[in-house]
Amino acid sequence: MEVAGHVLSAEDLEPQKGVLVGLHKNLEDSAFVKLPFDRVARTDGNGRFCIKGVAPGNYRIYALKDMDGDFRYAPGELLAFSRDTIVPRAIADVRRDTLWRDTVHIDTVKLTPITRYAPDDVVLLSFTEKRNSRMLLKTQRDVPEWFRVYFTAPSADVPVIKGLNFDEKDAFLEQRNATGDTLTYWLRPGSLLEQDTLQMAYTYETTDDSTGLAISRTDTLELVPRLTFAKRAKQKAEELEKWEKQREKRHKRGDFSNEQPPKEYLTFGKGLAGTLSPLGNVHFSFSEPPARIDTAAFHLQLKRDSLFEDAPFRLERDSAALLDYTLYAEWRPGQEYELTIDSAAVTGLYGLENRKTTQSIHIPSEDSYGALFLIIPDVDTTAVVELLSGEKTVRRERVNARHGADFFYLNVGTYYVRLFVDANGNGRWDEGCYAEGRQAEEVFYCPMHFDVKANWDIEQTWHARELPRTQQKPKELIKQKEAGKATPKSRNAERAAAKK
């Protein structure tokens, strides 16, 4: 007998090619880890598999990207599992073949007895388990002002630094990245900053190889910057010498316009944009942690006719980031704003100051945007709806109590929609865990696309669970394309072409 179906990625319903799918007669969970499969097959370009030669009985089914070739699951390998018991069976069926007398009239309908095997619609959703094993991966110190420590996984534990050739008290500002697995330590100004080599005992949480439990470990670190103060001073001297030579050439031409020697300023990163959505805000990412911000030196003005008037705003640091700040304001559609930041409005931790910056900000009118209003009856407020432009997430909204998700102020374009059921309420999609018997959080795609036009609202009811997963993801978004099947005729043509 046969068992057939599909393997899709649990995160984006992408067909999984070349994945091993196997059956176990042993129904214990441990069989997937300890025993090789009894019967196996591999998926094709559409993610479809067909396991043949299956004896009658009860089975558990799994999918596995078998990296080590032992037909068993090992941590780090892509997997999929089902709690359903697979019972292969043969079903007597009839195939109808129509014989035509001519192009208009049917001669006979031939009925041919066939045997169909079930189940043939198994859907396995694959994922790679989140890596919980935490190790110190590497350290990095490019410049004297900071050093960075990389881990393989995040931890709520705060590492402890004990200086071996310096006093560690109030010596650093700690910054974590968004995923929590990389820590950056900014050195506070003082004698420590002038010290090329930092020697420390670094105590952190790691995972014991034998038990898999979290333990505390202390490593001795010796950190030397790649670019020392001496090298930096040499570079600046070379830049100044180059500038002075260029100034002499300008003077010979009678050009005295640029008399200010090069100076290093605090930068804002990707910050200021000329056009902003009414739902957007202005983001700053400073080149070093700000030590002082004078909000009185920030001026946001709304243009009325030919005059500007002050507009209220609020400048706040992003929750977990030392460098990132956001300027919030009530952006009115169809209006023009001007943001001016005076020189020295922001002073960095190491004394750098910003230069004066002025940026015009245009807020397009409401009729230049479209809107999309979705009603999704078969999900609740745990669902998070993502609006996609291609595979890029443009916007996300949690389903409200009315089973709706509303997207305002959309730019003209083609959009797709997917949702995931945020079972643990952390606001992001999470993979499953085989040891806990937990599947990855459910993902659904709307099979249609939405062409958003200016000054146009789209209202659509979408039953997320109506179609099987294999029919949900729009073809335009599927990256894995099945190669055309080779036929004897095409092979002969290829051989003939090769001989030429």
Model-identified regions with their sequence ranges:
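N-terminal targeting or signal-anchor segments and their processing/structural boundaries
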Residues: 1-500
